[in-house]
């Protein structure tokens, strides 16, 4: 029997909800068994309540129905619990007990204990579906506004200008989608100044043309929104969103934010949200479009043209970097650029920066060095120096260079021109101490005559006067325009010449006043002077350095008796030529002394030779230069110098007889020609 009861119950549970039904206790109308617990789940269609009534009730009576009972539950809550015997109070009705619930589900539970002293027949009950007024029968109304009941259900409706949400219960206001595009206007909450609707979300947008920002102006008294709760949360709120900026949420009585809001954007979204509770009068504000301003600086270290108090959309300025700063784009640098105030309030080309000019590493100079500056940016300082003691700065004050605004290293005197280290002239590394004449004089070191040049063919001498110029006698080079020369060696033995520097002539310049004649018949040595430009500069050092040129003042006119130095590898009283350098001191002599000497050729007297003011007579008996010394320097001390310094007063030219007096070309008379020739031919010749 229990199996049959269970199957019938499962079949009843799985059945569709019915409008009515019967419930009987086990074995009804016979006595119900002991130790029974049975339940019935009643369900009627949605939209209906349940009316449950008993027509027979005969259950063991106990206090609080503790032994046997029939219990009625709805939604987990007990609606009633019955036991004992009951009869109808109305003679015209068989109903002894009834229950009515507004829900469509109900549970009936019958329980009996282990023994009954009497025979109890249980209960008979019936249920029917009854209409429920959902609008009034519940504590909370299911609709936010209007509730409409019908048999088996209800529906919600809304006032005019409201719409029903998707949940079909709550009403809201259709306040989204409005777009304001005028440059000035007013926006208000729905129904303002009457209470705004509940359960609403209003989305408005102000969209102005590019280049204008939306400026919101609010009065405090025009704002009244449900205030924040104890946790600071706004149940109803107003929010402004412009780009990635958010202003708000705002709520309360009186606007709590700034009364003027500059959004920096031409688009402003307005979001107003409300819940179902308290409603206030809402809000209103005015707005206007203001040209979007750009900041008053595009980049640092610059100035602007034109200068204005405020820059707005479409304004164009020229940005010029301050002195010492530049704009670097790739590998190209410039000092100015143009920038336009854009619609987003930002300057075009705002990524360009005026950076300090970088002059780069200072260029090296020949025969000198430059300090490595700490950095090479604008304002940095570096210093040049020359290789001492053989070179010095050609221009005093040209040592210090500063990184200038144009990106060049600049000196106050030379500008961007690099300093020049020129050879120190006239100072031998070892002073000459001998007193002997060269004709049979003493062996000396090249360090005492570092300007001495050896001409290999014809065997002769010359004087180094600059790193690329040799001064010699015209008769030395008139027959050989490509002479082979050496400097820096005391010995002219072929194997020893390698210790010095070989010089290559690039071009020979003979004085235009020199008359070319057969050497054996020559009687006129006037203007016996020539210049040789070297192909490559000579490196100076202790054995190689130039001799100074004479000045143009009268101090450089040698007086009779003044001593000078001569050097060379020419003939001596015992040898036709020597291989080791010899040097001597000899005095300046009156010119008539040279004219009185008889020559080695008895057929030609000295009276037939030409004597001019371009010649110096020097030497004496046993004190003279000779064959092989031609072109060498007759060196004298520079006047008024504390440190001994030598200049080339004369060049070995000719003499009637070796070992007596000799004739020297007076170099002072040719200074203009020398300097002019050197200046005009400073650049390498082009073949």
From Swiss-Prot:
| Keywords of the record | Calcium, Complement pathway, Disulfide bond, EGF-like domain, Glycoprotein, Hydrolase, Hydroxylation, Immunity, Innate immunity, Metal-binding, Protease, Repeat, Serine protease, Signal, Sushi
Q: Where is the active site?
A: 475 (charge relay system), 528 (charge relay system), 630 (charge relay system)
Query: What's known about how it's activated or inhibited?
Result: Inhibited by SERPING1.
Can you supply one Gene Ontology CC term for this chain's record? extracellular space
State its Enzyme Commission number(s): 3.4.21.42
Q: Which InterPro entries match?
A: CUB_dom (IPR000859), EGF-like_Ca-bd_dom (IPR001881), EGF-like_dom (IPR000742), EGF-type_Asp/Asn_hydroxyl_site (IPR000152), EGF_Ca-bd_CS (IPR018097), Pept_S1A_C1r/C1S/mannan-bd (IPR024175), Peptidase_S1_PA (IPR009003), Peptidase_S1_PA_chymotrypsin (IPR043504)
What PROSITE patterns does this protein map onto?
A: ASX_HYDROXYL, CUB, EGF_3, EGF_CA, SUSHI, TRYPSIN_DOM, TRYPSIN_SER
Keyword Signal in annotation? yes
Q: What are the annotated disulfide bridges?
A: 65-83, 135-147, 143-156, 158-171, 175-202, 234-251, 294-341, 321-354, 359-403, 386-421, 425-548, 594-617, 626-658
Query: Which molecular function GO terms apply here?
Result: calcium ion binding; serine-type endopeptidase activity
The residues the entry assigns to the signal sequence are 1-15
Q: Which domain of life is it from?
A: Eukaryota
Q: What is this protein called?
A: Complement C1s subcomponent
| Source organism (scientific name) | Sus scrofa (Pig)
């Amino acid at each position: 029997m229990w199996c049959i009861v269970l199957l019938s119950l499962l079949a009843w549970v799985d059945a569709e909800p019915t409008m009515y039904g019967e419930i009987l206790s086990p074995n009804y109308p016979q006595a119900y068994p002991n130790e029974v617990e049975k339940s019935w789940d009643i369900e009627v269609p949605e939209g209906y309540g349940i009316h449950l009534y008993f027509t027979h009730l005969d259950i063991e009576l106990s206090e609080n129905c503790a032994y046997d009972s029939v219990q009625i539950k709805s939604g987990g809550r007990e609606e009633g619990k019955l036991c004992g015997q009951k009869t109808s109070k109305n003679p015209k009705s068989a109903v002894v007990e009834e229950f009515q619930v507004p829900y469509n589900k109900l549970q009936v539970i019958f329980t009996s204990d282990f023994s009954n002293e009497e025979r109890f027949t249980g209960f008979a009950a019936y249920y029917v579906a009854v209409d429920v007024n959902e609008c009034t029968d519940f504590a909370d109304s299911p609709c936010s506004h209007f509730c409409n009941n019908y048999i088996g259900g209800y529906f919600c409706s809304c006032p005019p200008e409201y719409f029903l949400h998707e949940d079909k219960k709550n009403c809201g206001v259709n306040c989204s989608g409005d777009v304001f595009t005028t440059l000035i206007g007013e926006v208000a909450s729905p129904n303002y100044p009457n209470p705004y609707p509940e359960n609403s979300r209003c989305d408005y947008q102000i969209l102005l043309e590019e280049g204008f920002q939306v400026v919101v102006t609010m009065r405090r008294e025009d704002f009244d929104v449900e205030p924040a709760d104890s946790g600071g949360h706004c149940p109803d709120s107003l929010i402004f969103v412009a780009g990635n900026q958010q202003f708000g949420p705002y709520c309360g009585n009186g606007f709590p934010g700034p009364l003027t809001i500059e959004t920096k954007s031409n688009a402003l979204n307005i979001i107003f949200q409300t819940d179902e509770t308290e409603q206030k009068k809402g809000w209103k504000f005015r707005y206007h479009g203001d040209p979007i301003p750009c900041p008053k600086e595009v980049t640092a270290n610059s100035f602007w043209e034109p200068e204005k108090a405020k820059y707005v959309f479409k304004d164009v300025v020229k940005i010029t970097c301050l002195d010492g700063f530049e704009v670097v784009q790739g590998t190209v640098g410039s000092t100015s650029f143009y920038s336009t105030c854009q619609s987003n309030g930002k300057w075009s080309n705002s990524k360009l920066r005026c950076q300090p000019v970088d002059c780069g590493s200072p260029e090296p100079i020949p025969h000198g060095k430059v300090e490595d500056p700490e950095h090479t940016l604008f304002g940095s300082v570096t210093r040049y120096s020359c290789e001492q003691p053989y070179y010095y700065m050609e221009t005093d004050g040209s040592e210090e260079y500063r990184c200038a605004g144009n990106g060049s290293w600049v000196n106050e005197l030379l500008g961007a021109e690099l300093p020049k280290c020129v050879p120190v002239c006239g100072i031998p590394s070892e002073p000459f101490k001998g007193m002997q004449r060269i004709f049979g004089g003493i062996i000396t070191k090249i360090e005492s005559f570092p300007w001495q040049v050896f001409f290999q063919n014809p065997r002769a001498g010359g004087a180094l006067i600059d790193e690329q110029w040799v001064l010699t006698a015209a008769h030395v080079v008139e027959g050989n325009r490509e002479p082979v020369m050496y400097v820096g060696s005391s010995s002219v033995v072929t194997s020893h010449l390698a210790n010095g520097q070989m010089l290559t002539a690039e071009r020979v310049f003979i004085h235009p006043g020199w008359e070319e004649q057969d050497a054996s018949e020559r009687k006129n040595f006037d203007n016996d002077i020539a210049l040789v430009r070297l192909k490559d500069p000579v490196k100076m050092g202790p054995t190689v350095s130039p001799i100074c040129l004479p000045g143009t003042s009268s101090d450089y006119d040698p007086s009779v008796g003044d001593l000078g130095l001569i050097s060379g590898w020419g003939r001596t009283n015992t040898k036709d030529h020597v291989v080791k350098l010899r040097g001597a001191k000899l005095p300046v002599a009156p010119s008539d002394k040279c004219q009185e000497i008889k020559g080695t050729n008895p057929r030609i007297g000295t009276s037939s030779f030409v004597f001019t003011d371009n010649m110096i007579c020097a030497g004496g008996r046993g004190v003279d230069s000779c064959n092989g010394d031609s072109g060498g320097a007759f060196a004298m001390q520079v006047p008024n110098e504390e440190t001994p310094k030598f200049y080339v007063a004369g060049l070995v030219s000719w003499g009637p007889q070796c070992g007596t007096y000799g004739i020297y070309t007076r170099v002072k008379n040719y200074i203009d020609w020398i300097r002019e020739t050197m200046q005009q031919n400073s650049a390498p010749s082009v073949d």
